């Protein structure tokens, strides 16, 4: 980005695609990326935000949408609902991310989620079709998950 700006190109913002998991990306590195982009004098746009709660096949990596794996129960363990411990872990991850966004609210122009409710998350069909994921802030009945209230309180 510095090279482009040095050539006189106007750059107003940069998007950080944020398909996250319960344990990735490393939050310190994620926050450093926000700082690094903001240091270039642009607004940071958090894009495609979701959190994958499901295990991925060994050898899986990146975002190659052509990459598909066979459905196996071990990669789809929460068809009857998210267990309380996983829900707690997911809520903590949402809050950890939104605490970073709040801390850097002067540097971040917007946060865009990659969908509205769990029913329609792309992660139900990729990288394994037919899975049940809980990747968004609204459940399958379009009801806000409890963590939404915590996020709202954070920004008040």
Residue ranges with predicted function:
Residues 1-20, 24-27, 37-46:
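Acidic/histidine-rich catalytic cores of soluble enzymes
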Residues 25-45, 51-156:
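Aromatic-rich peripheral "rim/lid" segments of glycoside hydrolase catalytic domains that contact
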């Amino acid at each position: 980005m510095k090279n482009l700006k040095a050539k006189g190109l106007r750059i107003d913002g940069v998007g950080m695609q944020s398909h996250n998991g319960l344990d990735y990306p490393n939050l310190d590195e994620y926050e450093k990326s926000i700082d690094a982009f903001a240091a270039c004098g642009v607004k940071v746009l958090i894009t495609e935000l979701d959190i994958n709660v499901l295990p991925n096949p060994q050898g899986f990596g990146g975002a190659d949408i052509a990459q598909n794996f066979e459905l196996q129960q071990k990669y789809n363990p929460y068809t009857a609902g998210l267990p309380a411990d996983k829900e707690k872990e997911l809520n903590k991850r949402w809050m950890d991310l939104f605490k970073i966004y709040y801390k850097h609210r002067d540097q971040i122009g917007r946060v865009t989620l990659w969908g509205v409710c769990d029913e329609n998350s792309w992660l139900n069909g990729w990288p394994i079709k037919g899975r049940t994921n809980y990747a968004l802030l609204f459940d399958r009945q379009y009801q806000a998950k409890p963590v939404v209230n915590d996020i709202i309180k954070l920004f008040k």
